[in-house]
Amino acid sequence: LGDGGLTNYQLSITLNSQTDKEYLGYVKSLIRKLFHIQLTVMLRKNENTARIVVSGRNLVELLKGYGLKVGNKVKQSVNIPAWVLKKNEFAIACLRGLMDTDGSCYMYAHNVNKKRYYNFALCFTNASVPLLRSFYAILKKNGYYPSVTDRRVYMHRKNEIAEYFKKVGTHNNKHLHKYQKFVVQKILPGR
């Protein structure tokens, strides 16, 4: 659903080879643990990408059985499978995975009455409208107040972001490091 894709014979997951190095290790370990299967990592240095590839028709059929689709996710308007949405524990885990792959954390500045303020935000970006709506709905169901645009879901409230990192968490240390630096340690950008 996030940075992955299915063909008739392969599962592939593409990550940033520079900023997602630690997360790449986590994903590789998770695939081996869940499927007991061999995988390949292809690095494209000129694109800063690392592509995890797992070949096997049986794996693809298994994933299709869980509700994932072969082909272009946007054209097919992919969504979180219904069985995941029915159980909040699964929905939260899916939310975490989507944010880990298609999400970002950042500081932004704005001025009010000539005074500069800094805020931290979470942003999930995806071109599949049903997937975006489900992501938004899971956040709302769990007491958050996100905002949404045509391709993004944002969280800006400081207390909600703190709660998100406690309740939902992240397996992508890139996000955790930014949260700790900007929110916990209160280090402003460029310092």
Describe these PLM feature segments.
Residues L1-R191:
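Internal intein/HINT superfamily modules and their associated LAGLIDADG
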